[in-house]
Amino acid sequence: TPTEAFSYEESGTFRTTDLNYSVSRVGDSLSEQLTSYGFNVTHDKTYHDYPAYSGSYGRSMSTVQGILNNQPNSDIIIDLHRDAIADTSYAPSVQIGDEIASQLMFVIGTDGGGLEHPNWQQNLKFAISIQKKANELYQGYLDLF
């Protein structure tokens, strides 16, 4: 949360728990868009990297598993992050027409890091199909990692 010693800046790399300035606000917009296309959306706003970043992926996985247990017919789970990149030599943005947009990145977890991801290959295929369409519409908008 912003304090006197820290005030939020759009270009900043610090995390905040203020929902008006966090990735949850992006999730609100994404949820609205997906709902407008007829998708049934559950937007979980659990903080997984607060108070500590260490272990956040495992906590996120627990949240996703809980959603899948309660809503087993879910077709898509999006674990949305705002990764703060302090390295100024890398600019995670792309120009689309006259607008500058944040670049999207899909990070596909595998079984290699110690956490089980039994469907990672299906996730990768799905992400590639989205990347292909996104890049047809807006070249360079979506990367896979």
Give residue spans per PLM region.
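N-terminal catalytic or cofactor-binding beta/alpha core of small enzyme domains
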Residues: 1-75, 84-90
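Active-site-adjacent mobile loop/cap segments within catalytic or ligand-binding domains
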Residues: 142-145
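Long, well-ordered alpha-helical scaffolding segments within enzyme catalytic domains
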Residues: 24-31, 120-138
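Short, intrinsically disordered/low-complexity patches at protein termini
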Residues: 66, 139-140
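A short, glycine/acidic-enriched catalytic loop
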Residues: 86-123
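Anionic group-transfer/hydrolysis microenvironments
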Residues: 81
